[in-house]
Amino acid sequence: MKIATFSVLLLLLFIFPVALAQLKFKFYSESCPNAETIVENLVRQQFARDPSITAALTRMHFHDCFVQGCDASLLIDPTTSQLSEKNAGPNFSVRGFELIDEIKTALEAQCPSTVSCSDIVTLATRDAVFLGGGPSYVVPTGRRDGFVSNPEDANEILPPPFISVEGMLSFFGNKGMNVFDSVALLGAHTVGIASCGNFVDRVTNFQGTGLPDPSMDPTLAGRLRNTCAVPGGFAALDQSMPVTPVSFDNLFFGQIRERKGILLIDQLIASDPATSGVVLQYASNNELFKRQFAIAMVKMGAVDVLTGSAGEIRTNCRAFN
């Protein structure tokens, strides 16, 4: 994978104090020198079969990192006696676990008990973003896997789609993200879809009024009402690509400026004074958006990580050792 020079320079400049304090680039260069190549090749194969893997892995990485840190706690399967983060409401539709399993199996065959599941998620997400048209960027590695996975943590911590802009900025800010990072991470919705349960109130009964949300384009609201009349309906979060939302670009920001945001928080960032200027910058400059997204992803990947002797290296990403 070709790494763009601007990405390397900016990442070193902006996230060195955050990420490199505990993690390091090329962590597996001696212990498992082919690790990143193995991950990339398997992600490429999956992307060729299903380009929506970009959105799936980005969401998985987000949901893992913001609950107890990037420790692969989201990958743990529940047992008959113990639930896991997979049982949390926000995680019901998280997918991509089979690809992580496939990568882990390949790495265990070549480098047993060496590459953590949390690093696999981070690397696989990076590769999927690039394949989907997003930025290429380097990520430090050396994460270790956690020992705890509870649905209560995810239910309590992960933000709902109707969070306020103030709440969203506070959520990200508590993890070291600024407004540019926060809005850039929401830009991942350029490759996402949402089930009707996350937005149906905006098109049918906004805040109990019996009417659609006035901040939503009325033509879009009508189309979404039809979509949600069918059980199991969903919609592309980027309405510039309503059929195949798999192209990673800044068109999402232009859409929300035209009142075509699907999730409430997406629409709010386009109008709130705290974020609207950033939205305009990203809508006007695709390279700026991609550059900041790369920075934000590396910051996110360093949230509350376990390193050194903390945690473990799972041999099966779905179960503690």
Swiss-Prot record:
Its cofactor is heme b; Ca(2+). Substrate binds at P159. GO terms for molecular function: heme binding; lactoperoxidase activity; metal ion binding. Disulfide bonds join C32-C111, C65-C70, C117-C317, C196-C228. Ca(2+) 1 binds at D64, V67, G69, D71, S73. It is found in: Secreted. The record marks R59 as: Transition state stabilizer. It holds the Pfam family peroxidase. It comes from the Eukaryota. Heme b binds at H189. The keyword Metal-binding applies. SUPFAM superfamilies: Heme-dependent peroxidases. Transmembrane segments: none annotated. There are 73 peroxidase genes in A.thaliana. Belongs to the peroxidase family. Classical plant (class III) peroxidase subfamily. Removal of H(2)O(2), oxidation of toxic reductants, biosynthesis and degradation of lignin, suberization, auxin catabolism, response to environmental stresses such as wounding, pathogen attack and oxidative stress. These functions might be dependent on each isozyme/isoform in each plant tissue. This is Peroxidase 28. It comes from Arabidopsis thaliana.
